[in-house]
């Protein structure tokens, strides 16, 4: 399956900024059989099985997190960029490979569950995932691990995290 996935991921040089090699995973969802195979694989992870809930990261993480949530019968909450969520929020700023941003989680969503699997499309520097884990931990929650479709190994994001990382493809 790995070779099939690699063929479906397109690289865009100098996007969104000069010097960045953007890996576009959206080709995967255009191939339902491969997408399903990927979701079945990710859903069977011990990290997913042991977590009470899934937290997906804005925006492409929602695609994979939603599908995994359905397949694994796990609730899903979202970590969103500024101005996208109503209500009382838990917020944190983070650094990206190409800038700075912040993420928010609705506090009421965090009340029901104590252990989480983080799902995103890609792991680069680890800044986004680290932000989500710190948000969860600051609310007394446990992060069991991270599942991503793509991991950019040269950026060493996994080494900044204190929990297991499972990636379907590495570049």
From Swiss-Prot:
Q: Which Pfam families match?
A: Pribosyltran (PF00156)
Q: Looking at the record's lineage, which domain of life comes first?
A: Bacteria
Task: List the GO molecular function terms.
Answer: adenine binding; adenine phosphoribosyltransferase activity; AMP binding
GO cellular component annotations of the record: cytoplasm
Q: Where in the cell is it found?
A: Cytoplasm
Write down the EC number: 2.4.2.7
**Membrane-crossing residue ranges in chain numbering:** none
Q: Which reaction does it catalyse?
A: AMP + diphosphate = 5-phospho-alpha-D-ribose 1-diphosphate + adenine
Indicate yes or no for the key word Glycosyltransferase.
yes
Q: Which UniProt keywords apply?
A: Cytoplasm, Glycosyltransferase, Purine salvage, Transferase
GO BP, sorted A to Z: adenine salvage; AMP salvage; purine ribonucleoside salvage
Which top-level enzyme class is recorded in the Swiss-Prot or TrEMBL entry?
transferase
Under InterPro entries, the record lists: Ade_phspho_trans, PRibTrfase_dom, PRTase-like, UPRTase/APRTase
Pathway the protein contributes to = Purine metabolism; AMP biosynthesis via salvage pathway; AMP from adenine: step 1/1
* UniProt entry tagged with the keyword ATP-binding: no
Q: Which HAMAP family match?
A: Aden_phosphoribosyltr (MF_00004)
Q: What does this protein do?
A: Catalyzes a salvage reaction resulting in the formation of AMP, that is energically less costly than de novo synthesis.
Q: Spell out the subunit comment.
A: Homodimer.
Give the similarity note: Belongs to the purine/pyrimidine phosphoribosyltransferase family.
Name the chain's protein. Answer: Adenine phosphoribosyltransferase
Q: Which organism is it from?
A: Prochlorococcus marinus (strain MIT 9515)
Upper lineage is:
Bacteria, Bacillati, Cyanobacteriota, Cyanophyceae, Synechococcales
């Amino acid at each position: 399956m790995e070779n099939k996935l690699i063929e479906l991921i397109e690289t865009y040089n100098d996007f969104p900024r000069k010097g960045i090699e953007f890996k576009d995973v959206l080709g995967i969802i255009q191939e339902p059989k491969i997408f399903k195979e990927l979701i079945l694989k990710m859903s069977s992870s011990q990290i997913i099985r042991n977590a009470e809930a899934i937290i997906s990261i804005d925006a492409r993480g929602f695609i994979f997190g939603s599908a995994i949530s359905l397949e694994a019968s796990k609730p899903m909450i979202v970590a969103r960029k500024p101005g996208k969520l109503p209500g009382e929020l838990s917020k944190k700023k983070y650094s990206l490979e190409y800038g700075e941003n912040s993420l928010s989680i609705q506090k009421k969503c965090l009340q029901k569950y104590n252990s989480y699997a983080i799902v995103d499309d890609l792991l680069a520097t680890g800044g986004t995932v680290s932000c989500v884990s710190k948000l969860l931990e600051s609310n007394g929650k446990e992060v069991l691990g991270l599942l991503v479709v793509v991991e950019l190994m040269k950026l060493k994001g996994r080494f900044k995290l204190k929990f297991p990382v499972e990636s379907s493809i590495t570049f």
